[in-house]
Amino acid sequence: MIRQRLDEALVARQLYPSRARARDAILRGTILVDSEPARKPSQMVLQDAVLTTADEAQKYVSRSALKLIHALGHFNINPESRTCLDIGASTGGFTQVLLQRGAEHVFAIDVGHGQMMLEGPRITLHEGLNARDLKLEHISEDVSLILCDVSFIPLHIALPSALDLVKSGTDLIALIKPQFEVGRQGVTRGGMVKDETAHARVCAEVAAFLVGNNWSVYGTIPSPMDGGDGNIEFLIAAKKN
């Protein structure tokens, strides 16, 4: 009987939209093969194998939703009735969580186009907008919660405009991606940052950047899952003084 890689089988059966999402689910231990936990994405499975998933990420347009849910719980930040700014909104994983948790409105911005998978009267989408070019005319003075998940740009470049525009008491949750913070010299050929010392240094530098911009840092925690490329990520939360 024909065998197939597990990650390919999950996509072929339309349980996941891509091998990357399937691989992530397997590595997080959410996939069963004939009632047994899956071992690895390359595991070979029979065509008639029973594949089941108990993956919370499937409820959302992006797995990043689980990262925000973890941070909201850990830092005890409630989006209910708040106006939020989602920087690097992409498909809308963070925005979806905010709306489900009662956010009054979400201003979603992304430098790309055509990625957002959500729509509705509580979302204002600004596509093709670089976070560095953010102005008050793009959002509202009522924003009291900033979320940030950006790639290919360090936070000290992506965040200043947003940090300056909002009022005292505004909360921030940002995803720290070391591979975009350390510079080329700190990244391996495969784009990985595995050095724990580098992780600690990056988190400390982001925290110092926020403090230097008149924000008080609640803390920094590991993300509950790695990035799509396998890099370890962190979540930082802060409040504007």
Task: Kindly label every feature range from the protein language model.
Residues 169-183:
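Conserved beta-strand signature within the Rossmann-like core of class I S-adenosyl-L-methionine
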